[in-house]
Swiss-Prot record:
NCBIfam families: transcriptional regulator NrdR. The keyword Metal-binding applies. The lineage of its organism: Bacteria, Pseudomonadati, Pseudomonadota, Gammaproteobacteria, Alteromonadales. It holds the Pfam family Zn_ribbon_NrdR. This is Transcriptional repressor NrdR. The keyword Zinc applies. Keywords: ATP-binding, DNA-binding, Metal-binding, Nucleotide-binding, Repressor, Transcription, Transcription regulation, Zinc, Zinc-finger. The gene is nrdR.
Length: 149
């Protein structure tokens, strides 16, 4: 670790503590040359897989796109922001747990539908109608029938 004061390359760790619910390590360091002290934070870099779209193109996972879709689905429904955050964290954890560098967009959509069905059935129908491109009332009826099973 380079000293931010004198740019020396040799520093020593004086103290280490877990912070952020154990997801980060706070380290107090001292430069062996100028003896200045400074604090660093370490955390694991969790990389999300890339998304393979239906047309075959690949793009980085976009958390804002996921949040936007979920917010549209739950609009004017009794679902809290905390519930949305929990659902999004569950989706991201599931995607990371695949261990794959790339995942199909269908997987992301299906995970979102699974989350919405637990949060709010009306929100699920809203999202499914757009995601599955329902074209007539019978498709809505089939989706509702699946919910009632």
């Amino acid at each position: 670790m380079h000293c931010p004061f004198c740019n020396a390359t040799d520093t020593k760790v004086i103290d280490s503590r877990l912070v952020g619910e154990g997801h980060q390590v706070r380290r107090r360091r001292e430069c062996t040359e100028c003896h200045e002290r400074f604090t660093t934070f370490e955390g694991a870099e969790l990389v999300m897989p890339r998304v393979i779209k239906r047309d075959g193109t690949r793009q980085p996972f976009d958390e804002e796109k996921l949040r936007s879709g979920m917010l549209k689905a739950v609009e004017k429904r009794p679902v809290s922001i905390d519930q949305i955050d929990q659902a999004m964290n569950k989706i991201k954890s599931t995607l990371r747990a695949t261990g794959e560098r790339e995942v199909p967009s269908e997987m992301v959509g299906n995970l979102m539908m699974d989350s919405l069905i637990e949060l709010d059935k009306v929100a699920y129908i809203r999202f499914a109608s757009v995601y599955r491109a329902f074209e007539d009332v019978s498709e809505f009826g089939e989706a509702i029938a699946r919910l009632q099973k």
